[in-house]
Amino acid sequence: EHKKILTADKHKIPGLRNLSHFTPMAPGVPVPLHYHSDIIELHFMVKGQRKTYVMKGGVRTSYCATGNNLFITRPYELHTTGHIAQNRCEFFAMQLDLKEHDNFLGLNQHYSNILCHRLLNMDQHLYHVGSSQISMLRTAFNLISYGTEGDSIAGVQYLTCVLASLNYLTAVPAQEEINEQLNSDIGHALKYIEQNIE
């Protein structure tokens, strides 16, 4: 299986919706345009590359995350991977529910609020992430996936360390972001042709 998803009803960790690991066995299925209310979505790229498009005011901005990059979408932010299947890549993804801001990851109210505030104030979409953070995230995922209470407690500690370190990350310098007005089906057709005909 090229993906493993740990859902909130299984892991029961406050503030963590889904925690997923996608391996590079098969290209990803295109993700349609959508948003999440009260949820920050994080994609930690291990290897390969993954494009995501963020929509704002009828303008689509393209971001390309590669190995050791973190891509973030914020609550109510429209995003998609486009109409074309993604390249093979490995990444961890998580959805953080900020409605749990008083008990986020089981932290007390004070620290929970601080961590949620820090996450909401990350103002870029793309950041460099260290291999130690990826390693801690992999450990967190493995421990939480075992399903025992003791393993979950240890896994949450690793996950909390990763999330608490994110506000120290350096943003990826502005790429050649593609800003396009989305008012024409012809534009979509031309873009598809340009990307798929050699």
Question: Which functions belong to the PLM regions below?
Answer:
Residues 1, 59-60, 176-180:
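Polar low-complexity intrinsically disordered regions
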Residues 8, 67-68, 184, 195:
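Intrinsic-disorder/low-complexity regions
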Residues 1-22, 78-149, 168-172:
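A hydrophobic/aromatic-rich effector-binding and dimerization subdomain
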Residues 21-117, 151-152:
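N-terminal regulatory/effector-sensing and dimerization cores
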Residues 120-131, 145-159, 163-198:
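Short, Lys/Arg-enriched, Trp-marked, Pro/Gly-tolerant hinge/linker segments that flank
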Residues 18, 31-32, 39, 123, ...:
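A general marker of short, structured functional hotspots
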Residues 41-44, 133-140, 158, 162-165:
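Amphipathic, well-ordered alpha-helical segments in soluble domains
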